[in-house]
Amino acid sequence: MKMYQIEEVKPFMAQLLLQETFDKFCVSVAEIRTIVPIAIKGTMSHDWLSPEDAEKYKELEYIPWKLLRPVVFELIKGKQTPDFLKIQFVYYSENGDCGGLRVQFEAGTLTCLSTYTPVEFSLDRNAETLWDENCRAFLKKHEIVSTQL
């Protein structure tokens, strides 16, 4: 588990809300506090989707960010930044392990926290270390300026 403080909030938020940077992730939970607090549980309701999308996303437990991004953008767009924003991204590996990236904005500070949950308990931390490195490489690849805390 590694935490990074994002140094340039505006460019990061543009990538998060307006670009496809995070679209390969799914969202397990999102919380937004603007004029009212909003909590989004990312569990997909496959019956609500079109038949094409239901087939396309049938393997997913959580909603792809690609589908949720426009909704979140509509909730927070405007002149004021939200008081609080937290998005828990998840990414499943082929063996079922779950890597996560929690994005949190609060009191003007933006952080990302890498998380890793193996399918089975293990004392071996190689997969967790690899996920942490992949998250760091992801930030670097997308030119997201950050400092490890």
Where are these regions (language model features)?
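Generic structural motif
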Residues: 9, 32, 41-43, 90-94, ...
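Generic alpha-helix detector with strongest preference for long hydrophobic helices that associate
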Residues: 3-6, 68, 101, 108, ...
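Mixed-charge, glycine-accented linear interaction segment located at domain edges/termini
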Residues: 112-149
